[in-house]
């Protein structure tokens, strides 16, 4: 399939992790990881409470979401749901997305990690991986992210990678108002805070899919 869709050959590698688009086998592993648990059931770290689905529905919902993201890839509106592998096993997803990237040169990120893989620094490392890809390969100028104020682990990941606070947002979460911290990372701040070695393979054939980059016009 990579002959026609080169993004399947993209690999982003750090000292402990490898990130790539999920194959059929990796989708199965991701579903197993989800069924083992992603967060404490008393908490909800996501604005869309997808983890509340029944065990019977979670596999289909997961596949449907991943396939929708892959099928909907366009150069002016894309999302890369990269499977995060530890010792060859898929333990979570690190997504990178953008709208009108050739013009805005801005990316956003989101992620989840299996509960038993949390607390080992993988969250910081997988974010560092996609930030390197965004700034070094795609030549992004700004990266954004957000975390609910009651999610200190996610907040810490952003701050360790050099993001600056960029305000608050109010959103509905499971029928109630919740506040989210907004974060912004410039190219200069990213370069100053880089601590993780990252290697990208297989991007040359992918580059045309992201379109010609235009200098920002204000």
UniProtKB/Swiss-Prot annotation:
One of its GO terms (cellular component) is cytoplasm. The keyword Transferase applies. Residues 32-188 form the N-acetyltransferase domain. Pfam families: Acetyltransf_3. One of its GO terms (biological process) is succinyl-CoA metabolic process. It catalyses: L-lysyl-[protein] + acetyl-CoA = N(6)-acetyl-L-lysyl-[protein] + CoA + H(+); succinyl-CoA + L-lysyl-[protein] = N(6)-succinyl-L-lysyl-[protein] + CoA + H(+). Keywords: Acyltransferase, Transferase. Its EC number is 2.8.1.-. GO terms for molecular function: protein N-terminal-serine acetyltransferase activity; protein-lysine-acetyltransferase activity; protein-N-terminal-alanine acetyltransferase activity. Substrate binds at residues 94, 109-113, 119-124, 145-151, 160. Dimer of dimers. Acetylates and succinylates nucleoid-associated, DNA-binding protein HupB. This is Acetyl- and succinyl-CoA transferase Rv0802c. It comes from Mycobacterium tuberculosis (strain ATCC 25618 / H37Rv).
């Amino acid at each position: 399939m990579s002959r026609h869709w080169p993004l399947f050959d993209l690999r982003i590698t750090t000292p402990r992790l490898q990130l790539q688009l999920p194959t059929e086998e990796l989708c199965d592993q991701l579903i197993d990881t989800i069924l083992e648990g992603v967060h404490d059931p008393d908490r909800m770290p996501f604005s869309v409470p997808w983890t509340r689905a029944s065990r019977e529905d979670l596999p289909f919902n997961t596949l449907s979401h991943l396939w929708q993201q892959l099928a909907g890839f366009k150069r002016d509106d894309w999302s890369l749901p990269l499977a995060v592998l530890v010792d060859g096993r898929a333990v979570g997803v690190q997504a990178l997305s953008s709208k009108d990237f050739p013009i805005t040169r801005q990316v956003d990120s989101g992620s989840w990690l299996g509960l038993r893989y949390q607390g080992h620094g993988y969250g910081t490392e997988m974010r560092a991986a996609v930030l390197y890809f965004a700034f070094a390969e795609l030549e992004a100028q700004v990266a954004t992210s957000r975390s609910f104020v009651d999610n200190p682990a996610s907040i810490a990941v952003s701050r360790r990678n050099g993001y600056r606070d960029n305000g608050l947002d109010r959103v509905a979460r499971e029928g109630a108002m919740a506040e989210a911290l907004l974060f912004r990372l410039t190219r200069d701040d990213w370069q100053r805070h880089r601590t993780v070695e990252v290697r990208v393979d297989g991007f040359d054939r992918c580059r045309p899919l992201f379109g010609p980059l235009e200098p920002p016009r204000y």
